[in-house]
């Protein structure tokens, strides 16, 4: 049973969010072809994670057996988000470009899930590269929308693109290598002209094709791997969704 973790970070509502439409399209397409798929929804736009503070840092860098109840509470949200991540085979992130970078809620999510002892280890005996990821084998799909254009390598705004490099730099915390990242982009949103319409059509087609290919890969593998359950929590996550129609637009 494949598991999708769908992370939406747009502050916009469904009818106005291009990235929400793309994540819904990916999820629907994938589930139509792999009907036993489990989908975990994490809506950061509606339920933004807490920012990391001194209490989080103190608790995270304290050995688990030495944490008091106050420290456990400080890490409770992080634990829930990491539990969701651990369950996932594919992580689908709806990531609009805000001021050339990622939305604050998405950055807060990365800060909550990038945690020593849960998603990475730290050992100075490794020399200048002491960090090693603890998760692996996941595929990362980034579905993005940009008001302007030309942010790809070689584009006229490549130097202003802090979103794609930022996600790629953190992907190892999610258990995805750089070779396991697929990014699909809608551009020209603020121009609202034929270029934007063409970009949307191309992105929609690419999303369907990618979801179809990845779902087919899982169906052909027939691995039968069992993933642990993730229950609904007060931060806006829910699991065990098998949508064929009616997903967010």
What are these regions, as identified by a protein language model?
Residues 10-13, 147-151, 188-192:
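A short, flexible beta-alpha/helix-coil linker loop
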Residues 116-121, 136, 177-179:
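Short, structured loop/turn "capping" segments at alpha-beta junctions
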Residues 6, 93, 140-144, 183:
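Structural beta-sheet core signal
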Residues 122-173:
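Short, glycine-/small-residue-rich phosphate/pyrophosphate-handling segment
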Residues 33-35, 134-136, 175-177:
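Short, structurally constrained coil/turn elements
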Residues 44, 145, 186-188:
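Active-site donor-binding loop signature of nucleotide-sugar glycosyltransferases
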Residues 1-95, 100-110, 115-118, 208-239, ...:
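N-terminal beta1-alpha1-beta2 submodule of the flavodoxin-like/Rossmannoid cofactor-binding fold
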Residues 153-249:
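Glycine-rich phosphate/pyrophosphate-binding loop and the adjoining helix
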């Amino acid at each position: 049973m494949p598991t999708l973790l769908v992370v939406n970070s747009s502050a916009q509502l469904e009818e106005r969010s291009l990235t929400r439409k793309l994540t819904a399209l990916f999820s629907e397409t994938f589930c139509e072809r792999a009907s036993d798929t489990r989908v975990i929804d994490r809506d950061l736009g509606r339920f933004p994670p807490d920012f990391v503070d001194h209490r989080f840092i103190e608790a995270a860098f304290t050995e688990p057996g030495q944490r008091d109840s106050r420290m456990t509470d400080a890490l409770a949200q992080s634990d829930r988000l990491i539990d969701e991540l651990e369950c996932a085979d594919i992580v689908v992130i709806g990531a609009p470009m805000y001021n050339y970078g990622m939305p604050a809620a998405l950055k807060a999510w990365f800060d909550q899930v990038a945690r020593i002892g849960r998603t990475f280890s730290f050992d100075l005996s490794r020399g200048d590269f002491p960090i090693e990821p603890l998760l692996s084998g996941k595929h990362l799909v980034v579905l993005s929308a940009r008001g302007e254009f030309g942010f790809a390598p070689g584009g006229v705004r490549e130097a202003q693109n802090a979103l794609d490099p930022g996600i790629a730099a953190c992907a190892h915390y999610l258990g995805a290598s750089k070779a396991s990242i697929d990014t699909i982009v809608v551009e020209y949103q603020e121009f609202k002209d034929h270029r934007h319409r063409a970009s949307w059509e191309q992105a929609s087609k690419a999303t369907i094709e990618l979801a179809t290919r990845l779902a087919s890969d899982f169906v052909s593998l027939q691995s039968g791997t069992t993933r642990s359950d993730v229950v609904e929590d007060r931060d806006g996550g829910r699991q065990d969704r098998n949508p064929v129609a009616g997903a967010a637009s």
